[in-house]
């Protein structure tokens, strides 16, 4: 028997979530319960807050706020994980809630735990950086796509191959964004 198989006896190697559950365990985001994971069990917002705090790097901060359940719950709430959700303590997380929390995570400010000499936990919030941008180099921008290659929304626009123009700024690209022209 492999180590992975023994980790959670209710998530065998042929289970559809096997790879994801084991990766989340290896990364320290989940721990299970005495060798069981209970993949079909719904979780509460308190349990979800533990996972999201660990992903964001807020584990020590949440523990400093009295840990489980309220420290994690309050940390997740403070950093926007529950933004736009009705999160009554003890309620079960729905699929839609999970999608919203993932969206909020990706758009949350980047945070780092810093230890001070007197062992207090201080959180450094980088408001100009998001989790998504920092870890995946994906950034949100707003503007109008004016040119794609030789196509333009303006008659007198200078267009060239392998470029796009957004709000007057040109970018080199090897992708086709023609379907987004004018948006």
Please provide the spans of the model-predicted regions.
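N-terminal propeptides
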Residues: 1-181
């Amino acid at each position: 028997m492999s180590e992975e198989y023994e980790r959670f006896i209710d998530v065998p190697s042929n289970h559809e979530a096997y790879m994801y559950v084991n990766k989340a365990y290896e990364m320290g985001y989940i721990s299970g319960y005495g060798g069981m994971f209970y993949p079909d069990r719904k979780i509460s917002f308190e349990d979800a807050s533990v996972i999201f705090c660990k992903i964001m790097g807020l584990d020590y901060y949440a523990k400093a706020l009295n840990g489980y359940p309220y420290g994690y719950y309050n940390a997740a709430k403070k950093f926007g994980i529950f933004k736009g959700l009705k999160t009554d303590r003890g309620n079960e997380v729905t699929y839609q809630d999970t999608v919203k929390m993932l969206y909020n995570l990706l758009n949350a400010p980047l945070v780092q735990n810093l230890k001070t000499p007197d062992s207090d936990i201080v959180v450094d919030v980088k408001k100009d950086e998001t989790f998504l941008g920092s870890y995946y180099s994906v950034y949100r921008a707003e503007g109008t796509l004016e040119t794609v290659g030789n196509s333009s929304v303006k008659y007198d626009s200078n267009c060239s191959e392998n470029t796009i123009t957004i709000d007057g700024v040109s970018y080199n690209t090897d992708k086709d964004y023609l379907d987004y022209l004018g948006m």
